Amino acid sequence: MADNDSLDQFLAAAIDAAKKAGQIIRKGFYETKHVEHKGQVDLVTETDKGCEELVFNHLKQLFPNHKFIGEETTAAFGVTELTDEPTWIVDPLDGTTNFVHGFPFVCVSIGLTIGKVPVVGVVYNPIMEELFTGVQGKGAFLNGKRIKVSAQSELLTALLVTEAGTKRDKATLDDTTNRINSLLTKVRSLRMSGSCALDLCGVACGRVDIFYELGFGGPWDIAAGIVIVKEAGGLIFDPSGKDLDITSQRIAASNASLKELFAEALRLTGA
């Protein structure tokens, strides 16, 4: 495991890369977009590709021996295996559909894993000027101010956030809507922001109490947010209530009081 000085160095590099990528996102947000389809509703823009190239080039110059996993390179060349080596896991533009529509929940997400464990996380929304950071053992912050998860202890008064994903086959849609219908009877209300990384940050700073998603894109959606939630005092787990597998495309997050209550509610939906 890296020492504290190394973690601070990694964090500083990730923040620098995120802010540079943020400039590209901010510029592109207000311009006409060139949009390509990765699936029926899954989109990619030149901004996604440009940001990933910028972030990787910046970090590779500083840490040439580290490994790299990114959403767009993975989409083009296939899944890169996560090893124990220091690995930067990057979503250059989480919330691409939001970006295309001019909805300001967009961000760059940069996480670093060592021994397959996320230890540094940076999530930056350049439209709303919010920089979320977390380092293992050092706390989580929003624009430099320490954040923590909510103290909510009852499901019925909890605010839940989730996402509908990009699959539109009938079986998946039926499962998704049936699950949401069931959960809406157990929580105060439900939100969808369109960004997995920002949903995790929402749990970390107490804006929402619970997050879950089944079938998101890959580890780049969650690597940074995992650190930020944990360092804010929250729990990250598989929606079944078991330990998270970062490569499983299943995740849930909450405070300690709500974890078992929510996991049981999800189990009753068949998740």
Swiss-Prot record:
Its cofactor is Mg(2+). Substrate binds at E71, L93, D94, G95, T96, G194, S195, C196, E213, D221. Disruption phenotype: No visible phenotype, but reduced myoinositol and ascorbate levels. Mg(2+) 2 binds at D91, D94, D221. It catalyses: a myo-inositol phosphate + H2O = myo-inositol + phosphate; beta-L-galactose 1-phosphate + H2O = L-galactose + phosphate. One of its GO terms (cellular component) is cytosol. Optimum pH is 7.5. It comes from the Eukaryota. InterPro entries: IMPase (IPR033942), Inositol_monoP_metal-BS (IPR020583), Inositol_monoPase_Li-sen (IPR020552), Inositol_monophosphatase-like (IPR000760), Inositol_monophosphatase_CS (IPR020550). The keyword Magnesium applies. The modification N-acetylalanine is found at A2. Phosphatase acting on L-galactose 1-phosphate (L-Gal 1-P), D-myoinositol 3-phosphate (D-Ins 3-P) and D-myoinositol 1-phosphate (D-Ins 1-P). Can also use beta-glycerophosphate (glycerol 2-P) and, to a lesser extent, D-galactose 1-phosphate (D-Gal 1-P), alpha-D-glucose 1-phosphate (a-D-Glc 1-P), D-mannitol 1-phosphate and adenosine 2'-monophosphate as substrates. No activity with D-fructose 1-phosphate (D-Fru 1-P), fructose 1,6-bisphosphate (Fru 1,6-bisP), D-glucose 6-phosphate (D-Glc 6-P), D-alpha-glycerophosphate (glycerol 3-P), D-sorbitol 6-phosphate and D-myoinositol 2-phosphate. Belongs to the inositol monophosphatase superfamily. This is Inositol-phosphate phosphatase. It comes from Arabidopsis thaliana (Mouse-ear cress).
